[in-house]
Swiss-Prot record:
Forms a complex with MdtI. Belongs to the drug/metabolite transporter (DMT) superfamily. Small multidrug resistance (SMR) (TC 2.A.7.1) family. MdtJ subfamily. The chain crosses the membrane at residues 1-21, 32-52, 55-75, 82-102. One of its GO terms (cellular component) is plasma membrane. This is Spermidine export protein MdtJ. Its main location: membrane. Catalyzes the excretion of spermidine. InterPro entries: Small_drug/metabolite_transptr, Small_multidrug_res, Spermidine_export_MdtJ. Keywords: Cell inner membrane, Cell membrane, Membrane, Transmembrane, Transmembrane helix, Transport. Disulfide bonds: none annotated. It is found in: Cell inner membrane.
């Protein structure tokens, strides 16, 4: 199961690199940025497709997009001098909260440690 989470992590990293390369290519006009973008976005979708074999689609997609948006926004501010308004910050905080809710909502309930009552054993009751 752990390998599928690794696939998801690689999908997120590839998406971030691909999207930042797209911005770099549009600013610089260099062909290299477009080539990196094509390979990274393609790789991102391939890794995401592998991840959703065992990771719930809603969780995988929320993490893939959400973490990607968060990190891309930070690097866009640092590298491309994009603005970060209080409204954008509030949106990112809401996004992180939403990701946490989606992820925590998919946990499997823990099995009780008590013996199974339907195992054929009969107990006297008072």
């Amino acid at each position: 199961m752990m390998i599928y989470w690794i696939f998801l992590g690689l999908a997120i990293v590839a998406e971030i690199i691909g999207t930042l390369s797209m911005k770099y290519a549009s600013v610089s006009g260099e062909l290299t940025g477009h080539i990196v973008m094509y390979f990274m976005i393609t790789g991102s979708y391939i890794m995401l497709a592998l991840a959703v074999k065992k990771v719930a689609l809603g969780v995988a997609y929320a993490l893939w997009e959400g973490i990607g948006i968060l990190i891309i926004t930070v690097f866009s501010v640092l590298w491309f001098d994009e603005s970060l308004s209080p409204l954008k910050i509030a949106g990112l905080v809401t996004l992180v909260g939403g990701i946490m809710l989606v992820k925590s909502g998919t946990r499997k309930p823990k099995k009780p440690n008590s013996p199974n009552r339907n195992s054929g054993e009969h107990h006297a009751t008072a």
